[in-house]
Amino acid sequence: MSRILFYGLLLICVFLGFFFFFKKENNVIYNKIIQKSEDKVFTDETYTYLFKDGNLKELVFIKSEFMDPKLEHKKNRNMTGYLIDAYRAMSPSYNFDFAVHDNKILGFKSVIFEGFGDAQVSKHENNLPSEKWQQLKGFNIGDPNINEKFFHLKFPFTVKNTLRVTLSKGFFNKIKRLKRLKIVLVSNEDKEYKIDIENFLPKYNL
């Protein structure tokens, strides 16, 4: 009887160990939103990785697609122009959103992807469509000083600072091949927020 009890407890321990490992390895929340407007379709797929400790709370990867039959027709016919070139460059688009909580409004002056120190970084605002997006070589981190006039303020509540990093298609394809995502965010106060996690992107059809 005692032997049966022993093996029973052992099996329970093995099961619990597998369960917690499984939960840890699948710490990604997936969501898909589809919106339609007349004959146009907007699709957002989000993959959210939650951090347990520190002010860096989450990393969200976003794949966005915009389907416009008229522009798609022009794209397939290899036509050029302001709108069709922007559509070709940014459909689909790939973004990382980083959420950092603090009692202040933060700016981020630098983003470093380990292994890609020579990547071309732009710092223009996230406004589409724009000829700037057609010229995007590496990634864009936005204007780090857009909220500079608020940097000196401290608030009696938590401020959710979101940094959006837009990746070019070529840079995204390089990121997908990494085994781990090692990223450093540098704030306007020179504080570093470091990320070192398993690269979950190859697990999905992106």
From Swiss-Prot:
Domain of life per record: Bacteria
Any one cellular-component term (Gene Ontology): cell outer membrane
Record key words, sorted: Cell outer membrane, Membrane, Signal, Virulence
Signal peptide interval: 1-23
Cystines in this chain: none
Subcellular location: Cell outer membrane
UniProt entry tagged with the keyword Magnesium: no
Pfam families for the chain: BPTA (PF17044)
Principal localisation: membrane
Role of this protein: Virulence-associated protein essential for survival of the bacterium within the tick host and therefore within the natural life cycle of the spirochete.
Similarity-based family: Belongs to the BptA family.
Name listed for the protein in its UniProt record: Protein BptA
Species: Borreliella valaisiana (Borrelia valaisiana)
Gene: bptA
